[in-house]
């Protein structure tokens, strides 16, 4: 179904607003376990929004859910408990009054965004995600703003950050790690097919849905690059690939390096090149000074070693990550029926 473009004017300058259908960063910080209820059975990330059982999502005359196309104000929402705090604002659990649809409402302060000079980055995030609809990518349903704030209506990820779960358990087992690798490979293949490079895959930027399914979030460093070649440095120190440290041109293969680092961290509990100083970390990354504890299974070592290659062209392609024997033997990826239909 063709989606209707959000007609809100962009609050900065004369540029027109991007589409209201996109995915944006959400860093959800939780202190208490989630207790699913009828109101927390929310939509899957790549399908039309659905309300809780016994409740109906209101649609407009074209059959498109209102949450995607309607002009909202803050008065249209019941605001619940805070989910997280960030540099530019806060995230709250919220319910749209008309449809009772549960969302995460991210409230950004214009003054802080302007102070840090990141208006362009915010707009870029929205533009990049305008057409990314995938079961393992967090979705942005809509946005609106007033004189002081910008509000992003996001998919709610009830189980919060992957980072928090990793902190609690220290390491993940083979099944959970392989499942995450398959989910990531599939989602990134989708992104790369649309010429989108994430560039900052790490546990803090990965959220978990109701059934534990992965949701890629925080596209703050991502870029839509038709040439797929850029030279700017970004990302998290422990996850930076050699080509970015060395200031060389890079492409979508930076994401292959990142998921190799992630796989190692999930199994071991810390990134592979972590050191006491930044300079030492840089040195180890550039030299690909990779050492495995005896606890890392041989199959996982093989996968990680094929991803963490200094030469980007030698890194294992995403399709082969999904098909890797260790991933195939251990992954327990489960998609909702509607998601299976859409990615078939």
Curated annotation (Swiss-Prot):
Keyword annotations: Acetylation, ATP-binding, Cell cycle, Cell division, Centromere, Chromosome, Cytoplasm, Cytoskeleton, Kinase, Kinetochore, Mitosis, Nucleotide-binding, Nucleus, Phosphoprotein, Serine/threonine-protein kinase, Transferase, Ubl conjugation
Catalytic site positions: 200 (proton acceptor)
Modified residue annotations for Phosphoserine: 62, 227
UniProt entry tagged with the keyword Cell membrane: no
Expression induction: Expression is cell cycle-regulated, with a low in G1/S, an increase during G2 and M. Expression decreases again after M phase.
Annotated residues for binding of ATP: 83-91, 106
Modified residues (Phosphothreonine): 35, 64, 232
PTM per Swiss-Prot/TrEMBL: The phosphorylation of Thr-232 requires the binding to INCENP and occurs by means of an autophosphorylation mechanism. Thr-232 phosphorylation is indispensable for the AURKB kinase activity. Acetylated at Lys-215 by KAT5 at kinetochores, increasing AURKB activity and promoting accurate chromosome segregation in mitosis.
Annotated segments matching region Disordered: 1-22
Paired cysteines (S-S): none
Expression tissues: High level expression seen in the thymus. It is also expressed in the spleen, lung, testis, colon, placenta and fetal liver. Expressed during S and G2/M phase and expression is up-regulated in cancer cells during M phase.
Domain Protein kinase: start-end pairs: 77-327
Regulation of its activity: Activity is greatly increased when AURKB is within the CPC complex. In particular, AURKB-phosphorylated INCENP acts as an activator of AURKB. Positive feedback between HASPIN and AURKB contributes to CPC localization. Inhibited by ZM447439.
Effect the entry attributes to changing residue 215 to R: Abolished acetylation by KAT5, leading to impaired chromosome segregation
InterPro entries named among the record's database cross-references: Aur-like (IPR030616), Kinase-like_dom_sf (IPR011009), Prot_kinase_dom (IPR000719), Protein_kinase_ATP_BS (IPR017441), Ser/Thr_kinase_AS (IPR008271)
Record's catalysed reaction(s): L-seryl-[protein] + ATP = O-phospho-L-seryl-[protein] + ADP + H(+); L-threonyl-[protein] + ATP = O-phospho-L-threonyl-[protein] + ADP + H(+)
GO CC entries: centrosome; chromocenter; chromosome passenger complex; condensed chromosome, centromeric region; cytosol; kinetochore; microtubule cytoskeleton; midbody
Subcellular location: Nucleus; Chromosome; Chromosome, Centromere; Chromosome, Centromere, Kinetochore
Disease affiliated with this protein: Disruptive regulation of expression is a possible mechanism of the perturbation of chromosomal integrity in cancer cells through its dominant-negative effect on cytokinesis.
Quaternary state and interactors: Component of the chromosomal passenger complex (CPC) composed of at least BIRC5/survivin, CDCA8/borealin, INCENP, AURKB or AURKC; predominantly independent AURKB- and AURKC-containing complexes exist. Associates with RACGAP1 during M phase. Interacts with SPDYC; this interaction may be required for proper localization of active, Thr-232-phosphorylated AURKB form during prometaphase and metaphase. Interacts with p53/TP53. Interacts (via the middle kinase domain) with NOC2L (via the N- and C-terminus domains). Interacts with CDCA1. Interacts with EVI5. Interacts with JTB. Interacts with NDC80.
Family per record: Belongs to the protein kinase superfamily. Ser/Thr protein kinase family. Aurora subfamily.
Alphabetized PANTHER family for the sequence: SERINE/THREONINE-PROTEIN KINASE IAL-RELATED
Its job: Serine/threonine-protein kinase component of the chromosomal passenger complex (CPC), a complex that acts as a key regulator of mitosis. The CPC complex has essential functions at the centromere in ensuring correct chromosome alignment and segregation and is required for chromatin-induced microtubule stabilization and spindle assembly. Involved in the bipolar attachment of spindle microtubules to kinetochores and is a key regulator for the onset of cytokinesis during mitosis. Required for central/midzone spindle assembly and cleavage furrow formation.
Protein name as annotated: Aurora kinase B
Originating species: Homo sapiens
Organism phylogeny: Eukaryota, Metazoa, Chordata, Craniata, Vertebrata
Gene giving rise to this polypeptide: AURKB
